[in-house]
Amino acid sequence: MYICNCSYTSKLKAVFFFGLILSLCCACSRAGARRVSSYDHYWVKAADERVEADRKWADYLFNHLDRRTGSRSVALRQKPVQGTFLQIVVHVDAKGKHDYSTVLDGDVLRLTACDEDKMLWLIYQFLASGEDPRIESSDLPPAMIDIAHAEGDFAFEYRGIYSPSNADPELMPVTASHHVDYDWGLWGHNLRRVFPGEVPEEALAWVDGQRDENQFCFSSEQLFKAVEAYVTDNYGETGGVRFAIMPNDNSAVCACKACTAAGNTRKVATPSVSRFIRRLAERYPHHLFFTSSYRTTEVPPAEPLPQNAGVIISAMDLPLRPDFAGKRPAENFSRKVKEWRKVVSRIYVWDYMRNFDDYFTPYPCLGVLSERLRYFYSLGVKGLFYNGSGYDYASFDDLQTAALACMLINPDLPLESYTERYLKRFYPHASDILLPAYLSWERIVKEREALLPFYGGIADAVSAWLDPVEFGAFCDRLDGCAKRTDGMERRRLNELLTALQFTRLELLRMPAGAYDERKADLYLEALYGYTAFSGMKNYREAFGSVQSYLEEWNILKTENRESQNPLKGIRLSCQPAEDENAASLPVLTDGLYALPSDYHTGWFIASSRRFVLQVPPGKISDGAVLELSLLYAPAWHIFLPASVEVWQGEGKMASFGLPPVGEKEVFSKQRVSCKLETVNPDIPVELRFMQVAAARASVACDEIKVY
């Protein structure tokens, strides 16, 4: 039984003494038991040959044992006539006390599960247990239970992981995990899919006196009939499929007469959306329908919804760091969950397991995720969706996905032990290098109570856990080991090492770091090997082409090589001094440029409506040309300034001519310059910036140069 081993539940104290006695008794009863591997044969038997499910799964276990032992008559469906044997009794019991149990009693091992899905998982726990070397299990993640004696309930009914290591539909049942691309009829903001052609006008929201093609009217009968046809035609009436019914991802709310009468306001669409979901839930009582606590549907409905309705709540505002419980974000999240529990029977949480700006730098998140899962369980959350890197490679994703699949069954999984068993199974030669490194990163995150950002740069990793010198030594040791391995381990290591070159390149780009073009060339050459791996085209969620990154780096090397700047090392000042990024002023004169695709590293970013950068007296001569390197990235609210003027004292000296930029441009670097004819060497030179009139506008500059 999963009992949360933390302060979130009062069950622990009540069962502690009983559990201690029980475990001691079990230990005594097993002390004389034989190991599974000590038997000549396995006699696989259905608990009741008259029950179809028992026969089916006994046959399944027999067939897979026969295949994985090489058909050496190790597995039998009839009682062996000679030799020692372990009888394995398979039983599907919907009325059992727990979701699963395994009991080794003498020479009989009983495998019991409450349904067929869990029986399949339990069979693979036996096959992956590693008890018998005759059973080939090198392709299976290590078992998470003691196959001789285990019983328990799955902590969560839905266990979704959106990661490349969970993308094989044949492996998902083995790990008892889910994937939104396979087990949801509708997921996310994809309601548009119910219309095979154009969305009819009557199904569109009425916003500011006209139809809005970017939002739906949830009082529309045409919308309801389209969803009804989609559900019936694709999934029937009895399947128990999950559907997410969400408005499009914007702030528009339908204000037609019907939606307004339902209770919609200018910012809240909950009344019309919840009424729509109620109709669907009543129409299809065997399917599950979910709304989202997000943007226009963040607040719960006033009245409870049917039992087959639920809500998906994002954990984006819950920082991914240790010891988060009891702090304000957790209190706010708990309050939201409790409010929704009053009106729905199912609460699923959309949580996150990656830095979406950097998939390649290791992200030691397992300890924090374990803590979060115990917290979610204590709140009565019934399902989790973990947003990972989708189908794109992420460093250590194989280990983390396997461990997370186990933690979604039991959040109290002993992480260090499981990590050790996983790495020794899949990296037998390199585990002595990988294991201490990975566990040390997890421990550092815990000790520092470090924040693991959902969107962050290399400086965030260094702040949280990464020691640049030790990391470089780790990569070198791992590279040496990889050259002595072969087969699948060699391929896995090559893929990991290729990704880690990205991290080494990012460390070279850090302000006040150790930029070295010779090392950059070595790391770039290794990163070009990404083409050998189908999942390594992108290093981040959006605009993350590895090929584009490599091309930007080649430009960057040229920029840095040509950066002969009299201002190099000169400290500028900024007004207002309280600007949130004043500490990054040194990047403006460090002689190192930044990448336009990454605003995290190497950029001075200012969001004040007006701000002034001041160059000390005597640093700019008559006739000098002053050059600014600016970032234009409107998707990140970074724009070219409306104006930049150069002043000394009360006199304006010059203005920078700012180029037009394409509205559809994602990001680009723009260099602008102006000539200063006469400069007073006794007075500072001021660069006065004015922001454009845009919401949350910022200006970013990576270098100020004089020539």
Predicted regions located by residue number:
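Disordered, acidic Ser/Thr/Pro-rich linker "stalks" and the adjacent N-terminal cap
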Residues: 555-623, 629-640, 659-668, 696-707
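Short beta-strand-plus-loop segments that form exposed binding edges in beta-rich domains
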Residues: 688-696
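Feature activates predominantly on carbohydrate-active enzymes
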Residues: 35-45, 52, 57-60, 64, ...
